[in-house]
């Protein structure tokens, strides 16, 4: 089995190398994602899977209260506030659905971009692009089209894990921008559904410890630098939690939240 996998890897790596720059990889990833999104939209319909998502949309858009409101209970207040501002700026658009679909497609584009950056041969790029698209379609197309905030949070968290884990191949030279992508995706997962974020943390811890092990004891400076990412992430999580608690700090909201938890 290992011999066959090694043979396959050798075949993929063989051939003329085409090292693309960041702009070309980003353009290719965005183009594939846009074409994929347009194709599935032309063939299928996007639907709200859960009543909770429909409820949040109506609150954010102002249908429920008469004016757009960010108190949607299920997702953290700072992110809900951002969506509410979109409804205030351009009413009449389904911004909740657009944002949820956009996050799914953004995660796909980032995964494609990372694959294009890692693999240098045409065969490698084409093979793994095909693998990613086939795997995404088989495992996630239904979840993407019939979306809910929980599955979108899971997609953001999974993309963060992939981005961080694949970045360990060049841990010493990873840019601040690459680390920022990991932080933003993981933070987004928390803002959408904190329980999903917490479930992903053990896997993130394993990847973190693996990266530390790859650096070794001799490179203590780089080891200390690896602590910046989790520190920044949990500062953002802590700040978001404080803002969320402040938004729901009244006794009336505490009672409503208790009823929601009991449900």
Question: How would you name each of these model-derived features?
Answer:
Residues 41-60, 68-81, 90-94:
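Extracytoplasmic catalytic/substrate-binding loops of multi-pass membrane glycan-assembly enzymes
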Residues 130-156, 187, 191:
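Aromatic- and kink-enriched transmembrane "portal" helix at the membrane-lumen/periplasm boundary
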Residues 177-194, 205, 234-238:
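Membrane-interface alpha helices of multi-pass inner-membrane proteins
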Residues 1-39, 123, 212, 220-233:
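Start-transfer (signal-anchor) and selected internal transmembrane alpha helices
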Residues 194-211:
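Transmembrane-embedded, aromatic-rich helix segments that form part
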Residues 123-130, 162-187, 224-225:
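Short hydrophobic alpha-helices at membrane interfaces in multi-pass membrane enzymes
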Residues 102-120:
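Transmembrane-helix motifs of polytopic, lipid-linked glycan transferases
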Residues 198, 222-263:
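Juxtamembrane membrane-water interface segments immediately following transmembrane helices
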């Amino acid at each position: 089995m290992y011999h066959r996998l090694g043979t396959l890897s050798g075949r993929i790596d063989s051939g003329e190398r085409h090292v693309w720059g960041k702009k070309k990889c980003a353009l290719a990833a965005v183009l594939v994602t846009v074409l994929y999104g347009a194709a599935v939209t032309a063939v299928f319909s996007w639907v709200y899977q859960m009543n909770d998502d429909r409820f949040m949309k109506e609150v954010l858009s102002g249908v429920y209260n008469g004016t757009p409101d960010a108190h949607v209970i299920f997702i953290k207040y700072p992110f809900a506030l951002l969506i509410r501002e979109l409804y205030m700026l351009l009413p009449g658009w389904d911004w909740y659905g657009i944002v949820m679909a956009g996050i799914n497609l953004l995660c796909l584009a980032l995964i494609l971009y990372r694959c294009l950056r890692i693999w240098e041969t045409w065969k490698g790029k084409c093979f793994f692009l095909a693998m990613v698209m086939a795997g995404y379609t088989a495992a996630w197309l239904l979840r993407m089209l019939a979306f809910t905030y929980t599955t979108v949070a899971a997609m953001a968290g999974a993309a963060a894990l992939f981005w961080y884990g694949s970045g360990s191949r060049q841990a010493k030279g990873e840019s601040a921008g690459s680390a920022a992508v990991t932080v933003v995706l993981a933070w987004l997962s928390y803002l959408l559904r904190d329980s999903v974020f917490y479930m992903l943390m053990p896997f993130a811890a394993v990847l973190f410890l693996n990266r530390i092990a790859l650096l070794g004891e001799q490179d203590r400076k780089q080891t200390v630098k690896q602590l910046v990412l989790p520190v920044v992430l949990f500062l953002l999580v802590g700040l978001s939690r404080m803002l969320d608690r402040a938004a729901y700090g009244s006794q009336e909201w505490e009672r409503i939240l208790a009823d929601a938890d009991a449900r």
